[in-house]
C-alpha cells in the first residue's frame, strides 16, 4: 500500500472439501483495526464495493477472493503494508470453525 493508505484488501482462494456448503462470516487481521467481507456491485452504471454478511463456499468447491469480486477489506491499517510484510489472518465460518493463517506474505501491486 502507499505510505499513507488507510485501507487494503486480502485476496485468496478458500477450498471446501466437505459435503455441505459453508460460509465465511468474518475475518480478523492483526494489521488493521477493522476487517470486512466485501463484493463489487454495479449501481447506477458504476462499479462499487459493498459490505456483505458472508461469502458462501459450495460443498466440494472453492471460492476465489479477488480484485473486482469477493474480498476481505482491511480498514484503518495500523501500518503500511509493503512487500514481504507478514500478516496474520483469522477466518471464521458458520460451522463454528476458525482457520488461523500466520505470517502470510504480502505483495505489492
Please tell me what each predicted stretch does.
Residues 1-109:
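Compact, glycine-rich, soluble single-domain proteins
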Amino acid at each position: 500500500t502507499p505510505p499513507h493508505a488507510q485501507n487494503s484488501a486480502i485476496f485468496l482462494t478458500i477450498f471446501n472439501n466437505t459435503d455441505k456448503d459453508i460460509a465465511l462470516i468474518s475475518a480478523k487481521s492483526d494489521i488493521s483495526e477493522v476487517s470486512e467481507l466485501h463484493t463489487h456491485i454495479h449501481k447506477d452504471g458504476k462499479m462499487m464495493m459493498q459490505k456483505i454478511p458472508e461469502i458462501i463456499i459450495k460443498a466440494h468447491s472453492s471460492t476465489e477472493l479477488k480484485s473486482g469480486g469477493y474480498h476481505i477489506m482491511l480498514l484503518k491499517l495500523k501500518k503500511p503494508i509493503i512487500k514481504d510484510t507478514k500478516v496474520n489472518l483469522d477466518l471464521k465460518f458458520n460451522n463454528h470453525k476458525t482457520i488461523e493463517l500466520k505470517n502470510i506474505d504480502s505483495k505489492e501491486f
